[in-house]
Every structure is written in structure tokens, then in C-alpha cells.
């Protein structure tokens, strides 16, 4: 056996499939038509120019003609201009940058900027580098430092048993060092590399240099021009292996550092057009084609596509006159074939003859799961994913070859508006090149992301041949050739494979043979606002229906008017299904003609039915249809009370990859379904996909979708539940995984349940006190246990600023159509550390279908540090924020300023996740709710029985801090008592759970808090009844006014005058202390500060204060007033001690002996220093009697006391606490200095690298 296996040749052809599509046979016939002369734009995560196979084409041209990042994720603001001094400039990082003498810069000015590497590193690379840096740079040094600190602590504990004040401080110092090192290890956070960037003009072109070594020696760094000028690129280092190129915009004021955001884009490009001169068997489908790499996956958003990236990309596609676009991206859309992005794609296709190929999506196996734009946009060729037997062996190493099939996850049509959705299919897996930073040469990936470039490469071969023979083609003729020559697989349904598997050689022959004018045209098919006939809900198939269908020719952009006038087409219309009736002929000219199609689905069996009305040119019927009208009808099964609203299937046989679809009319009143799957096989475990979709108008399929990938063990059972909408058809699909070997038999049951709430959403206003909702059990006996859980509080913001401006050179559509941006600024306070989800309600959940170009928000802290960003899908972009003030900047782009101006007051919301969920009390009748008595627990409802419930308001002490009027609490209502019923109350609409939402949402609107009576206010009211003598009031007011002006005028005379008049008035001495301590010349008046502090301390009866604090309770009637007075005295005493201590410490820290001073002076200074030190020590220990050293007021004094005693561990402990309280750059620098004094250079280095990230010069660019 072993010998036979080793003798069998390796199936190289299955690694990157070309046989299945006819690409191999085409290249055998026409080896010169290998993609030469064809330019493919790859819109993806970016292509690595250093990856294997990405260097040259078969005819020696550069493989990648340009590399562009249209997202802005690699943009660096280089608007700051500087001139070198002595051949050096100071970068924005603070590093000294040495300008090499051989650089040419006639103007002598450099644009500088700064960029954190982790801002544009791919996620996988960032994680790898973080791990490596910790293991190599941090861990070895930190372990030594920690071991040394522990050793010193242990030695001191052994040698010193005494508890003197000096020993106590030393012990605290050593303990602080150990605690700090342990804390730094726990809080370790790698800032990553911080790169200084330079841009300048050498007299001929713009050049850029990135200080990739982070040491300022620019002579060892690459100098690059725009990639398109000379195909130059460099790498950030041998550890990263991340290749980058640059583009310079706006006269040097903006540098774009272009890297790949993930491995996806390079893999896609390698499939389409990779070329290996030495190993041709590894070639992509079209090795002779060139590539334009456009990065549309924004690294800031985990390579999510954005409107900005896509519209800029289409501008570049048009400007570069690309022949083909490959777009292996897409999302579910609420309405197909619409939106600004789709408009720009249509313009590139229809007006500029660019063929746009895109993935259909990976959201199958249910119907109508095609993504946008691949399966929903008329101008785009959507490609499904097919797997062949050779691929199974070569790529997946399956034990046995299975029949060819569509991948289980490949999205299926039709589109929601009736269009077929999937145009063609191609192999959906490959082992191909990936970027160098992955540290691997190739990788297996699968998805419609891989089938799209395979088809795109095949089309490139066709175009290469057409161009070589000067055969004219249009996007319409090429698409028709692909669809009319594709091979249909018998065992794969039309909605999965579309028109079939692409056949390159046959498509080429078709275009050579069919060159008529009619074949160059496109035809728009409309059925009202739809593109096909899609009858899915029960009411739509209950009776025959007539449909008006519009057919209109679409002429290529350069068509002469005379050709339009003379256009006359004689069409034969055919339908191969008896349930569809259509006219037999149509005369078409340059206008939209309408025909009537009658659909009578009454005699159709349960299940799915598809047919087409095809239009043939009677002059060349063998060329296939010129257009098709797709018609889909779904006949749903019915469940009723007699079957207990259940559907049961027993001993159902499943082959590998087999799919069984069940369309069911959901009973009116049903709210969830339960699916039970049981294996009948005792020897085979099997992988299954359970998938259910209900379609709602103008809602994406993911809004009402359930998906579960599961492994079913031998004789095992699986139970799942998901929400449903009553009265509409649902598709439930159970599919055996495509690679799951051996046959298996299973039983499965679908059971419907219904507990209906009168309100689809509960809106509760706190002022109403009691809110009612009614619940009905619609189908069966159901166990109820209603529960309202509040999970977040939502804050609504209004913009504090809105600015509109025209964008730069990258944002101009053809015919000089300038794009504009509006930037709205919002501010909010985060009351405590927690998770937030920012979103723009007006625009969120809209991407391709949005009427605005794009939306992008970035959140900044008060130092302008970027904390996170997000766009159309807010639930993907939750982030954790510490307590503090934050700014959100929201960018919205559009071609019309007037449309942007409408949004200048656009609200924005921030959802704050609650650390602990809150519950609202629910009662079964109004009187119980009114009295706050017995809460509802659980009950059983008979069918059709109605039960009211009453919800009471949330206690005021439960309202989260920071939430107030204008805010609301958000959560959900669950009704069922059973675990499955509760599980169905949460809808995981997308398989990644990104769009998880509540089936019955609850909004609890807040009102102002109750007015609180302050302590002692009653006593003050009584005191106020005793009218003061007016003269006495005037005297006191005059005194207070003089004290106020004393601090402003710095008048010692006023102080002395008041001191004589009011010798026992404590606020006077406090004001004097604060005045002296806040002066600019403070360092010259330290002794006066000490005296002023002593004066304050002497006027406080510390004995009486200590006795009061020791009291457990105060029975006196004016206890509240006494407490306020004592609290103020304690606070004043601590304040005075700290200010005195700081002054003494500053005196010692800044007193330095002068060289050559007289011996007597030196002795006097030494005695003075000892006296000051003694006084400082007394003050320190006195302070510890009254408060904790980590109290905010005491921190600076404790910090300075530690510095005086050269106890840098204690000092650093207090300094880190100061940073937590007030994270200023100066406080961080103090920490860094102490780290260096302690010898912890690794901590200092990492913290220093954090500074330019935490304190950037300005907000980052969009």
C-alpha cells in the first residue's frame, strides 16, 4: 500500500484548480493568451509585492503596477514642515533624526509626521510581534529585576527585626519595588514601534522615508517614491517581514504607508494572476495579467470594507482603465441593487467597460443569502463556490473522492428582488501565495472569495485572446458568453451554481463566433421595482398572478446615435414550464418594451420551483438567450393544530453534502421554533448545518436568520431554538457538511410555539410608575416566566461642532465631481471604566445601500489619543474605556454639500454596558404592582388565553451613575419559562453573532432624580430663622471680600490687617496658605509657606478633632452640622500638613552645596538641612495619623517625601497613582525618571514609547 501511494503522482493541478474551468485546455491551445495585456484591479486587503509569484508577468512586465490604500488606515499627517539644523531635525516622536548628506532637497524643507506601527500592522502580525517582543525584550530583563527585588526584600526581613520609623520606610520601599514590578507585569502593554516619517521633494519627484529602525539613523532606512513610479517597496524588518510602499498626496502634506491588512488579498491575487517562472505548475489562472492592488479593507476596522475605500477604489479603477475588477468582499444588504456605492460601481461598469467580478457570499445553504454587491447588483458578476473531486484530494486531503458539489456555505440566490443572484460558479478553494509577514509561502483558503478570482483569472484569459485578435467586446457580451457557455452540474441546484461552472475555452469561442451588434448590448429586465418574479409568501402563491415585465436595451457608452436609431431586434420568447405563460415574440427597439407574464402556481407540489422566460434573437437562436426573466415560486407546507404544530421527518437518508430544504408556512401567532435532530446511525458521527431564513421587505436576510454548525455523534441528539415570524413562509434547511464522509440516517422535528406580546417593543417611561403589557399563548399550552433584563444605558449626544470641506485629490469622481466631507464633533463623559458601543442611528446598519458615501467615527481621549473607530455595523466595534472625558469625530461623505448640511445637528448615541444587569419587577395585577407586593413568578397559559402583566419603575438608587434625563436603559423581555424558549428570545442573526439582537427590546426612559436634602439643611433653616444683625452681616461680608481680594492682589498688608482683627478666623489662614502656595515665585517663598501652614495647623484643635473621629455615634441634636464642621477641619488640617510637607521637601530637593563655600556656611547649611529634614519627617508621620498616603490630596507630598529620602520605589508607587488620577505627560515623565533611577530601563523604554501614542500632536486623519 505504501509503495502504491508513493508512486502515485502528486495532484498539483488540484492545489489551484484550472482544469475544471477549461483554463488549462485554453492555455494549451493558446499559450500566448495567458492574460497578457489585461489589467486586473484587486480590491481587497492589499497585495504584498514581495510575496511569491507577485514579481513579474510571463512577458517580463511588473506584476503589480501600483499599490494603493484607499481606506486612509495608513495615512500620516505630514503637514508639519521643518528645516534641518546641523543636518538634524527633531521628529514628532522626540527622537533626533540625522539627515544623510546624499539626500537631495533643493528647498531644504521636510514634511514630518508620526505613525504607530500597530495602527497598520495586520492583526495576526501584531499579535505575533507583541508575543515576540514580550518574550525577547521584556521577559528576560523583567525576571532578573523582580528576582533581585525579592532577594533584597528577603535579606532585609532576615537582617532587621526592629520596627523603627527608618526601618519601616526601608521595608516599605523594598516592598513597593516588588509590588510595582508585579504590577508592571500584570499591566504590561506593548506600545509597538513608533515611526517618524519624512516627506520631501528632490526637485523631480516626491520622496518619503520611514525611520523603520526607530533610532534616527536615516542613512539605513529606505527612501521611496510613489510605488507606480518605479515599483519600489521596503520592509519594516526581518522580524516583521512586513513589506510596505508609499504614496504621497496633497503636495507632501499627506503620506500613505501602504501595507497589506491581511493575507486574503495576496491569496486572491495569486489565484487570479500569480506567476512562477521556475515552477509554472504553481501559476495562477492568468499568469500574464498585471495587477492593480487597491486596499479597501480598513485595518482600523479589522479590514472591514468602507464606503470611502470603495468609492476611491472605483475612481482609481476608472483612472487606470482597468479591464477587470476582482472583489472578494460583500455584506448582506437591506435592499438590493441600490445605494451610492452601487451607483459608482455601475458607472465604472456601464460607462467605462470594466468587468466587475465578485464573490456571491459565504452565507448558505439557505436561499436568498447572496451578498452585496456580488449577488444583488446588476452590473456585477456574482460567483458561487464549487468543489471538485481533485480539490478534495489535493487541498483537503480527504480519505476518498466525493462527487463534485457546491460548498455547503456558498450563498444561494435568488436575490430578494427576484434576480438569480449567482451568475456563475468556479472552484472555491486554493493553496496559493500569502504575504511574507505570515512566515509561510502558501496557505489553503476557501470561500467564494477564492472562486471569484479563479473566475476573474479565467475571464482575463478570454480578454487576452480577444485583445490579441482585436475583437471588440463589452461587459454585456462577455457576461452573456460566460453564462451561455457555463456547464451545469446535474446534482447542483440553479440557485447555488447560477448558470453553471465557468468554461474559459467555450466562452472565448462564443465571443469569436458571435460578434453581432445585438450581442454587444445589455438588456435591463424589470418587474415593477424588481428584477425578477419571486413568489415566496403563502398569499403570493394562493392564486394566479400577472406580472408586467419591462425589457430595455442598454447600449455601450460609445454607441453612435445612428446605431441606436437603426436598432431593431426580433425576439422569440420561450418558457419551459407549464405554470408560466408568456408572449411568443417581441419586437424591441431603443426603448423599454413591456410584456405580460402569467404565473399560476396552484398545481405545484410543495417545495421550490424555478424557471425562466428567455429572449432569443431569431437571427441567431443557437447563441443562447439575450436576456432571461427569472421566476421563482415557493410552495410552503402547512402545519396546524391537528399535528400539534409540528413537522416530523423520520429515518431521512443523507449523503455527504446533501441538502434538504423545507418551506413552511409559519402559523399565525408562532414566535419561536424548536428543532430536534436525532442520529439513527450507530457507527457514523456527522457534521450538519441547520439554517433557517425568513425574508421581510427592506430587511436583510440576516435580520431573521438562524444558523448552527453542529457535530452529531452516533445516536446523538441535538435541540436548537430560534425566533420566527408568524404568517410568513420560513425556509428551514438541514445540510450535511460537504466534506463529511459516509452516509447517515437521521430523524428531525420542527415544532412551533407561540407566546405573543401585544407590543413588539416595550417603551417604558419612568414617570408612569406602572406599565402594562399583555401576553397570549397562541398555539399550545405554554409555561410563562416573564423577565425584563436591562443590560446597558444609552446616552444621546448632539454635535458641538460641524465642519464641511472639499476632500483631496483622491476624492474626485469622473467629470471633476468633487466629493465633500462633514466632520461632526461630539463630547461625552465616561463616569467609570466600562464597555461602550458608539453608533449613529440614522446611518448605522447601512453600507452598500446607504445614500451617503460613507460614515466613519473615531473616538479620542482628552489628549487626542485614538481609542477606537467604527462604521456601519456598530456592534462589531465595542470598546472598553476608562473613566474620563472623550471626543467622537464622525465623518460623513457625499457629492452634494446640501445633503451634508442637512446632517449638521445629527444625533449620535453611546451605549454603556452595565457591569451588572438590572431587572424590573413584574406583577400579575395592578393592585399588587401598586403596593409593590407579590411578583410574578411563573404560570401556564392555555391556548388563546390572554394574561396582562404590570411593570413597576426602577428604584432611583439603581440608576447607573452618569445616566439622567435624555438617556434610557436598554434591555430585553423574555416570556417563556423553558430554556429553549429563553434561548429563542435572543436572535443570533449572523453566524459570528455580530448582529445579535433582542426579539422583544425594552427601552426604559429616565427622568430627573429626586431632590435630595443635604445633611444639616434643616438645622440651617432653623438658624436662618434667627435674623442676624445687619451690621454683623455687613462686617462678615466685608471680611470675606477682603480675603478674596487678598489672594488676587498678593497684599501682605491686607493679611496683617485681617489677622489683627480676626486672629482666630481659620479661613483667613487657609486663604493665605493657598495664595502663597499658588504663586509663580513659589520656590522663593517656601519658608513663608511653611509658616502659613503652621498657622493653619495651630488654629485647629487636633485633640477635639481626634476625640470626635473616635466617636461611634453622636446623639446631639445638631450632629449633622457638627459633622460638616469636623469634616472641614480634618480636610483643612490634611491640606495644611501636605502643603507644609511639599514646601519642606522642595527646599531639600533644590538646596545644593556651592563649591568653595566657607566652612561655617557649609556647617550652617548642613544644620539647616538636618532641621528641615527632621521637620519633614515629623510632618510626614503626622499626616499618616490623619489619612491614607494614597489619598488624592496627599499623593504629591508622599511622592516628594520619597524623593527626598531617595526611596525611588515608594516614589514610583505614588507617581503611578498620580498618573492614574491625572494622566499628564509631565506625570508620566516623572515615572520614567524614577524607573531609570531604579535601573528598570526596560520599563522606562516601553513607557517612553507610549508617550507619542498617548499624547499625539493632533487628531489622526480619517
UniProtKB/Swiss-Prot annotation:
It is found in: Cytoplasm; Nucleus. CDD domains: Peptidases_S8_Tripeptidyl_Aminopeptidase_II. The active site is at 44 (charge relay system), 264 (charge relay system), 449 (charge relay system). GO terms for cellular component: cytosol; endoplasmic reticulum; nuclear body. The modification Phosphoserine is found at residue 915. Keywords: Acetylation, Aminopeptidase, Cytoplasm, Hydrolase, Nucleus, Phosphoprotein, Protease, Serine protease. It comes from the Eukaryota. GO terms for molecular function: aminopeptidase activity; serine-type endopeptidase activity; tripeptidyl-peptidase activity. Pfam families: Peptidase_S8, TPPII, TPPII_C, TPPII_GBD, TPPII_Ig-like-1. This is Tripeptidyl-peptidase 2. It comes from Mus musculus.
Amino acid at each position: 500500500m505504501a509503495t502504491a501511494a508513493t508512486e502515485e503522482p502528486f495532484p498539483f493541478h488540484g492545489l489551484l484548480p484550472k482544469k475544471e474551468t477549461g483554463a488549462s485546455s485554453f492555455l494549451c491551445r493558446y499559450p500566448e493568451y495567458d492574460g497578457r495585456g489585461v489589467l486586473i484591479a484587486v480590491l481587497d486587503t492589499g497585495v504584498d509585492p514581495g510575496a511569491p509569484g507577485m514579481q513579474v508577468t510571463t512577458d517580463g512586465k511588473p506584476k503589480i503596477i501600483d499599490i494603493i490604500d484607499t481606506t486612509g488606515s495608513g495615512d500620516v499627517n505630514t503637514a508639519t514642515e521643518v528645516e534641518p539644523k546641523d543636518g538634524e531635525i527633531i521628529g514628532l516622536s522626540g527622537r533626533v533624526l540625522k539627515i544623510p548628506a546624499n539626500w537631495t532637497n533643493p528647498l531644504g524643507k521636510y514634511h514630518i509626521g508620526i505613525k504607530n506601527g500597530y495602527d497598520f500592522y495586520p492583526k495576526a502580525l501584531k499579535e505575533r510581534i507583541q508575543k515576540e517582543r514580550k518574550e525577547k525584550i521584556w521577559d528576560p530583563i523583567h525576571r532578573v529585576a523582580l528576582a533581585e527585588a525579592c532577594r533584597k526584600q528577603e535579606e532585609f526581613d532576615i537582617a532587621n527585626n526592629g520596627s523603627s520609623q527608618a526601618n519601616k520606610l526601608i521595608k516599605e520601599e523594598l516592598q513597593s519595588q516588588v509590588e510595582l514590578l508585579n504590577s508592571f507585569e500584570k499591566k504590561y502593554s506593548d506600545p509597538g514601534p513608533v515611526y517618524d516619517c519624512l516627506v520631501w521633494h528632490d526637485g523631480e519627484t516626491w520622496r518619503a522615508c520611514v525611520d523603520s529602525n526607530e533610532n534616527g539613523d536615516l542613512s539605513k532606512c529606505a527612501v521611496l517614491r510613489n510605488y507606480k513610479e518605479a515599483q519600489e517597496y521596503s520592509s519594516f524588518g526581518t522580524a516583521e517581514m512586513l513589506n510596505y510602499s508609499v504614496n504621497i498626496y496633497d503636495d507632501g502634506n499627506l503620506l500613505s504607508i501602504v501595507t497589506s491588512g491581511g493575507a486574503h488579498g495576496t491569496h486572491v491575487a495569486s489565484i487570479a494572476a500569480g506567476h512562477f517562472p521556475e515552477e509554472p505548475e504553481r501559476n495562477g489562472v492568468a499568469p500574464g495579467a498585471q495587477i492593480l492592488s487597491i486596499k479597501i479593507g480598513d485595518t482600523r476596522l479589522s479590514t472591514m470594507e468602507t464606503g470611502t475605500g470603495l468609492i476611491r477604489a472605483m475612481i482609481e479603477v476608472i483612472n487606470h482603465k482597468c479591464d477587470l475588477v476582482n472583489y472578494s468582499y460583500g455584506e448582506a444588504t437591506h435592499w438590493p441593487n441600490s445605494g451610492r456605492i452601487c451607483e459608482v460601481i455601475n458607472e465604472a461598469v456601464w460607462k467605462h467597460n470594466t468587468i466587475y467580478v465578485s464573490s456571491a457570499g459565504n452565507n448558505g445553504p439557505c436561499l436568498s443569502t447572496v451578498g452585496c454587491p456580488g449577488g444583488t447588483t446588476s452590473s456585477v458578476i456574482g460567483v458561487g463556490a464549487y468543489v471538485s473531486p481533485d480539490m478534495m484530494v489535493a487541498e483537503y486531503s480527504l480519505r476518498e473522492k466525493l462527487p463534485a458539489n457546491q460548498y455547503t456555505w456558498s450563498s444561494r440566490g435568488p436575490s430578494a428582488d427576484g434576480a438569480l443572484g449567482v451568475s456563475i460558479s468556479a472552484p472555491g478553494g486554493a493553496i496559493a501565495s500569502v504575504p511574507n509577514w505570515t512566515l509561510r509561502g502558501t496557505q489553503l483558503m476557501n470561500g467564494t472569495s477564492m472562486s471569484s478570482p479563479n473566475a476573474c483569472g479565467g475571464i482575463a484569459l478570454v480578454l487576452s485572446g480577444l485583445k490579441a485578435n482585436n475583437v471588440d467586446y463589452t461587459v454585456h457580451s462577455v457576461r452573456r458568453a460566460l453564462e451561455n457557455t457555463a456547464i451545469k452540474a446535474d446534482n447542483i441546484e440553479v440557485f447555488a451554481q447560477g448558470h453553471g461552472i465557468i468554461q474559459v475555452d467555450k466562452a472565448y469561442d462564443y465571443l469569436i463566433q458571435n460578434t453581432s451588434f445585438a450581442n454587444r448590448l445589455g438588456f435591463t429586465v424589470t418587474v415593477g421595482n424588481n428584477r425578477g418574479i419571486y413568489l415566496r409568501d403563502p398569499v403570493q402563491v394562493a392564486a394566479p398572478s400577472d406580472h408586467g415585465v419591462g425589457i430595455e436595451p442598454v447600449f455601450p457608452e460609445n454607441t453612435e446615435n445612428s446605431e441606436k436609431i437603426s436598432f431593431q431586434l426580433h425576439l422569440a420568447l420561450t418558457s419551459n414550464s407549464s405554470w408560466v405563460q408568456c408572449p411568443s415574440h417581441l419586437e424591441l427597439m431603443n426603448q423599454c418594451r413591456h410584456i405580460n407574464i402569467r404565473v399560476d402556481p396552484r398545481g405545484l407540489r410543495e417545495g421550490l420551483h424555478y424557471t425562466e422566460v428567455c429572449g432569443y434573437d431569431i437571427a441567431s437562436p443557437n447563441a443562447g438567450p439575450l436576456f432571461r426573466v427569472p421566476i421563482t415560486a415557493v410552495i410552503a407546507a402547512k402545519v396546524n393544530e391537528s399535528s400539534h404544530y409540528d413537522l416530523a421527518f423520520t429515518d431521512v437518508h443523507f449523503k455527504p453534502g446533501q441538502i434538504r430544504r423545507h418551506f413552511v408556512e409559519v402559523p399565525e401567532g408562532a414566535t419561536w421554533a424548536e428543532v430536534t435532530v436525532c442520529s439513527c446511525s450507530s457507527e457514523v458521527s456527522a457534521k450538519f448545518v441547520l439554517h433557517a431564513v425568513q425574508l421581510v421587505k427592506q430587511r436583510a436576510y440576516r435580520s431573521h436568520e438562524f444558523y448552527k454548525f453542529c457535530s452529531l455523534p452516533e445516536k446523538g441528539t441535538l435541540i436548537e431554538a430560534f425566533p420566527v415570524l408568524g404568517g410568513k413562509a420560513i425556509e428551514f434547511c438541514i445540510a450535511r457538511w460537504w466534506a463529511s464522509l459516509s452516509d447517515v440516517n437521521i430523524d428531525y422535528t420542527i415544532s412551533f410555539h407561540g407566546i405573543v406580546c401585544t407590543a413588539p417593543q416595550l417603551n417604558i417611561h419612568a414617570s408612569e410608575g406602572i406599565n402594562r403589557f399583555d401576553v397570549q399563548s397562541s398555539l399550545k399550552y405554554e409555561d410563562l416566566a416573564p423577565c425584563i433584563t436591562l443590560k446597558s444605558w444609552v446616552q444621546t449626544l448632539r454635535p458641538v461642532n460641524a465642519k464641511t470641506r472639499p476632500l483631496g485629490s483622491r476624492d474626485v469622481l469622473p467629470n471633476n465631481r468633487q466629493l465633500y466631507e462633514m466632520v461632526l464633533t461630539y463630547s461625552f463623559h465616561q463616569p467609570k471604566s466600562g464597555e461602550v458601543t458608539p453608533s449613529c442611528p440614522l446611518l448605522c446598519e447601512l453600507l452598500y445601500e446607504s445614500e451617503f458615501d460613507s460614515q466613519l467615527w473615531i473616538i479620542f481621549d482628552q489628549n487626542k489619543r485614538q481609542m477606537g473607530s467604527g462604521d456601519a455595523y456598530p456592534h462589531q466595534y465595542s470598546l472598553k474605556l476608562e473613566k474620563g472625558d472623550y471626543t467622537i469625530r464622525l465623518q460623513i461623505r457625499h457629492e452634494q454639500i446640501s445633503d451634508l448640511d442637512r446632517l449638521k445637528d445629527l444625533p449620535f448615541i453611546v451605549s454603556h454596558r452595565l457591569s451588572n444587569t438590572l431587572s424590573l419587577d413584574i406583577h400579575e395585577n395592578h393592585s399588587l404592582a401598586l403596593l409593590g407586593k407579590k411578583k410574578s413568578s411563573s404560570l401556564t397559559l392555555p391556548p388563546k388565553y390572554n394574561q396582562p402583566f404590570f411593570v413597576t419603575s426602577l428604584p432611583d438608587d439603581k440608576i447607573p451613575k452618569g445616566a439622567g434625563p435624555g438617556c434610557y436603559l436598554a434591555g430585553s423581555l423574555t416570556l417563556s419559562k423553558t430554556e429553549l424558549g429563553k434561548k429563542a428570545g435572543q436572535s443570533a442573526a449572523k453566524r459570528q453573532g455580530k448582529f445579535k439582537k433582542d426579539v422583544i427590546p425594552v427601552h426604559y426612559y429616565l427622568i430627573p432624580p429626586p431632590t435630595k436634602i443635604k445633611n444639616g439643611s434643616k438645622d440651617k433653616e432653623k438658624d436662618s430663622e434667627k435674623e442676624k444683625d445687619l451690621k454683623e452681616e455687613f462686617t462678615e461680608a466685608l471680611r470675606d471680600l477682603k480675603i478674596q481680594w487678598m489672594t488676587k492682589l498678593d497684599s501682605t498688608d491686607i493679611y496683617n490687617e485681617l489677622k489683627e482683627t480676626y486672629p482666630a478666623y481659620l479661613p483667613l489662614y487657609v486663604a493665605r496658605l493657598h495664595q502663597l502656595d499658588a504663586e509663580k515665585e513659589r520656590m522663593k517663598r517656601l519658608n513663608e509657606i511653611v509658616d502659613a501652614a503652621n498657622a493653619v495647623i495651630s488654629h485647629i484643635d487636633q485633640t477635639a478633632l481626634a476625640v470626635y473621629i473616635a466617636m461611634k455615634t453622636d446623639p446631639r441634636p445638631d450632629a449633622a452640622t457638627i459633622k460638616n464642621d469636623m469634616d472641614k477641619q480634618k480636610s483643612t488640617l490634611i491640606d495644611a500638613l501636605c502643603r507644609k510637607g511639599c514646601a519642606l521637601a522642595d527646599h531639600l530637593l533644590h538646596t545644593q552645596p556651592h563649591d568653595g563655600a566657607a566652612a561655617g556656611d557649609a556647617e550652617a547649611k548642613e544644620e539647616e538641612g538636618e532641621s528641615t529634614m527632621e521637620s519633614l519627617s515629623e510632618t510626614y508621620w503626622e499626616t499618616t495619623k490623619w489619612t491614607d498616603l494614597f489619598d488624592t490630596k496627599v499623593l504629591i507630598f508622599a511622592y516628594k517625601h520619597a524623593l527626598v529620602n531617595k526611596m525611588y520605589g515608594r516614589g514610583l508607587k505614588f507617581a503611578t497613582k498620580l498618573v492614574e488620577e491625572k494622566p499628564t505627560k509631565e506625570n508620566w515623565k516623572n515615572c520614567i525618571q524614577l524607573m531609570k533611577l531604579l535601573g528598570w530601563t526596560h520599563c522606562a523604554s516601553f513607557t517612553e514609547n507610549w508617550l507619542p501614542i498617548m499624547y499625539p500632536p493632533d487628531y489622526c486623519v480619517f
